[in-house]
């Protein structure tokens, strides 16, 4: 599915991505010499409020091995941005313990579905089980009343 590209917004994302990589200690420039790399990074840091100039910086200074990763990150960010606009495509996140995720993942694989579908299935099964249990309890009560009379 294609999503509209918004230059200013995406340039800001690219700037943020590069700064985060730099803060994490990764090499973001194509320069081997540390003084050239430091100078290029300081130029990038000055471009925070001039997003369209980030593209020029990328063409001039960015390490080639980062190009594919940057494009993938921006593509994912663009998808999440546009999907967040509509309630039915908006993603929610939950924290799971590893063992819970592992059990859920195994169950989803058994069912041949996604994790979300597996959760939905398990909830509907639990609801159905509760209703059946309540019906059995009611029958037991009614039967015990009949027998005690």
UniProtKB/Swiss-Prot annotation:
Per the UniProt entry, what is one GO biological process? cell division
Lineage, top-rank taxon, reads Bacteria
Q: Please provide, alphabetically and separated by semicolons, the GO molecular function terms listed in this UniProt record.
A: sequence-specific DNA binding
- Enumerate the InterPro entries for this protein: Arc_rbn_hlx_hlx (IPR013321), MatP (IPR009390), MatP_C (IPR035375), MatP_N (IPR035087), MatP_N_sf (IPR038339)
Instruction: Name where it mostly resides.
Output: cytoplasm
GO cellular component assignments: cytoplasm
Residue intervals passing through the bilayer: none
- Compartments where found: Cytoplasm
Q: Which UniProt keywords apply?
A: Cell cycle, Cell division, Cytoplasm, DNA-binding
According to its UniProt entry, the function of this protein is described as:
Required for spatial organization of the terminus region of the chromosome (Ter macrodomain) during the cell cycle. Prevents early segregation of duplicated Ter macrodomains during cell division. Binds specifically to matS, which is a 13 bp signature motif repeated within the Ter macrodomain.
Tell me, how does this one assemble? Homodimer.
Q: Which family does the entry's similarity section mention?
A: Belongs to the MatP family.
- Please identify the protein, giving its name as recorded: Macrodomain Ter protein
User: What's the source species for this entry?
Assistant: Vibrio vulnificus (strain CMCP6)
Q: The organism's lineage?
A: Bacteria, Pseudomonadati, Pseudomonadota, Gammaproteobacteria, Vibrionales
Q: Which gene encodes it?
A: matP
């Amino acid at each position: 599915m294609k999503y509209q590209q918004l230059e200013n917004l995406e340039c800001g994302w690219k700037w943020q991505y590069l700064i985060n990589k730099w803060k994490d200690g990764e090499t973001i420039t194509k320069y081997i010499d540390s003084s050239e790399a430091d100078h290029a990074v300081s130029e990038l840091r000055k471009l925070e409020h001039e997003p369209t100039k980030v593209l020029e910086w990328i063409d001039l200074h960015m390490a080639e091995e980062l190009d594919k990763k940057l494009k993938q990150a921006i593509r994912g960010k663009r998808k999440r941005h546009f999907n967040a606009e509509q309630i039915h495509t908006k993603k929610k996140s939950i924290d799971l313990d590893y063992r819970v995720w592992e059990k859920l993942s195994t169950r989803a694989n058994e069912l041949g579905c996604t994790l979300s579908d597996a959760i939905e299935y398990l909830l509907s099964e639990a609801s159905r089980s509760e209703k059946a249990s309540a019906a059995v309890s009611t029958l037991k009560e009614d039967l015990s009343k009949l027998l005690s009379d």
